């Protein structure tokens, strides 16, 4: 038996849902398997449809493999490895390329996949902690991870997987690490164009054959009445928003983000509210709300208090295109698995902005 097979066997003996997977470079990444489930398995207001993370190009998949660790790039290829300073200062398109360089099935984490994991965490009663306060979680005083990068004399990033067990998504060694803080993580398959929410269908963003460049025709808007995916009203080449009253938009009303078919308050700046405060007005139908909740973009139907432990959502609805990252950075309780930053240009390359790779073997 090869040394790699022994390594994989040893990992699976300790963490049965983990796998050490080599890519086209014959180098390993550690992945966590997420099996298929329905919206109703993780959402009070969910239907019995398969969660979108488990549908690619119209075909259901049994599950997906998610990077156990934030990505580290070596020789222009992304890896999921413990004890590494996660690669940051990387823009959206380059992050995608570093994941796709691993070979067939490999891709940048998609928002659908991130949402599936976040909703699973919430349903199972545990939202992971992480490096959101200079090397530690703002709610923990005694735990710190191994520093890997400093800014202004303070710990900015920590080595992947070196935090306490509370930094794992399922609070075990078998879980996914650092989903809360450390670096924001780019997510594929979602953007905002002049305030209009645009996505790729289900988890189609996992397939590199479905382009995500600024002018790709794979981008779709959401019909507010029935949740169907339709051609967008607004394009990145437009000079302002196009609003017909049919597709889902993001409006900023009474200092909180509200899904609507109209935009009464558009600004080219980052504005925020607590995730539990995000709302949908009467123009958004039930099917569209289920889709938004399944993508961890709207609180569950029974939420009236901050059960998301302070996670925040930022958007910019007054500019041609903004891409999305999730998880947070040095924002204390505002960081977390439901935290979202929708104010990033696809060209942004910041020291607090990284990514994570995922793998679906059915994509060839």
Question: Across the structure, where does each feature detected by a protein language model lie?
Answer:
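Short secondary-structure boundary/capping segments
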Residues: 122-127, 191, 200-202
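C-terminal, surface-exposed recognition/capping segments
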Residues: 1-4, 139-157, 162-166, 170-179, ...
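A generic secondary-structure boundary signal that marks alpha-helix termini
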Residues: 75, 126, 192, 362-363
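Amphipathic alpha-helical scaffolding segments
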Residues: 113-116, 190-194
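Charged, compositionally biased non-catalytic regions
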Residues: 1-18
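Extracellular adhesion/carbohydrate-recognition regions
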Residues: 21-105, 194-263, 322, 354
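Short aromatic-cysteine micro-motif
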Residues: 49-179, 208, 223, 256, ...
